[in-house]
């Protein structure tokens, strides 16, 4: 019996088998969780249904987090099969491509700023608000962040601001929902080659640098993140809330390791 046996968890953001969300879903399935999934549009529906079936689930629901009505409809549909459940994984982030290249001050626009914060940060609390009455005591909400929330990363630009907003969201949500027995955390994952990451200029160079200077001398995998996510959504982490847990091989704690390469 796995340490998530008896838990019902909704997973968003599965786009391919390279997705961090897929690694999370795999780990949660292995540990006995019953899973449900969302997809953004019809283009992704068949793919997500296939992945869900591989992980023992037939609950696959459409949800566009840019629309409150879509979020409400999704949870209404979920409530027909799960009147109560035990949390969700928010693995959603987006900024227009022209915002993720070059000088931040020159690249950022009012519209790009709004879109990045709406999709990448506000959607997390919007989902929590919509399903609050459905969450069992002991539930856990989890989102995915990145070091760009704390440091200026080349080409990450407005997404760094959106992730900083998301991390603040985690703290405020944890404080607000804690009395109901709901925990809220984030994982700040190291760079991983995913479809989303491919939109960041020079991402391969970032990966190579990270691998060379990270204390464990490798980049993390979706399995690494998945295992940590399963723990954070389980009762094993019952005392952890409002935290941003770095799953990056120690990259975020090191300085000047590049000197060893010269």
From Swiss-Prot:
Record pathway: Lipid metabolism; fatty acid biosynthesis; Cofactor biosynthesis; biotin biosynthesis
Class in the EC hierarchy, top level: oxidoreductase
Catalytic residue positions: 146 (proton acceptor), 156 (proton acceptor)
Result for mutant: residue 146 to F: Large impact on catalysis, with kcat and kcat/Km for DD-ACP decreasing by around 50-fold compared with wild-type
Biological process, per Gene Ontology: biotin biosynthetic process; fatty acid elongation; lipid biosynthetic process; protein homotetramerization; response to antibiotic
CDD domains: ENR_SDR
Reaction equation(s) it catalyzes: a 2,3-saturated acyl-[ACP] + NAD(+) = a (2E)-enoyl-[ACP] + NADH + H(+); (2E)-butenoyl-[ACP] + NADH + H(+) = butanoyl-[ACP] + NAD(+); (2E)-decenoyl-[ACP] + NADH + H(+) = decanoyl-[ACP] + NAD(+); (2E)-hexadecenoyl-[ACP] + NADH + H(+) = hexadecanoyl-[ACP] + NAD(+)
UniProt-listed InterPro entries: Enoyl-ACP_Rdtase_NADH, NAD(P)-bd_dom_sf, SDR_fam
Documented effect of changing residue 156 to F: No effect on substrate reduction
UniProt KW Lipid metabolism keyword: yes
Site feature location: Involved in acyl-ACP binding: 201, 204-205
Function: Catalyzes the reduction of a carbon-carbon double bond in an enoyl moiety that is covalently linked to an acyl carrier protein (ACP). Involved in the elongation cycle of fatty acid which are used in the lipid metabolism and in the biotin biosynthesis.
Entry's family note: Belongs to the short-chain dehydrogenases/reductases (SDR) family. FabI subfamily.
Record-given protein name: Enoyl-[acyl-carrier-protein] reductase [NADH] FabI
Organism: Escherichia coli (strain K12)
Annotated gene: fabI
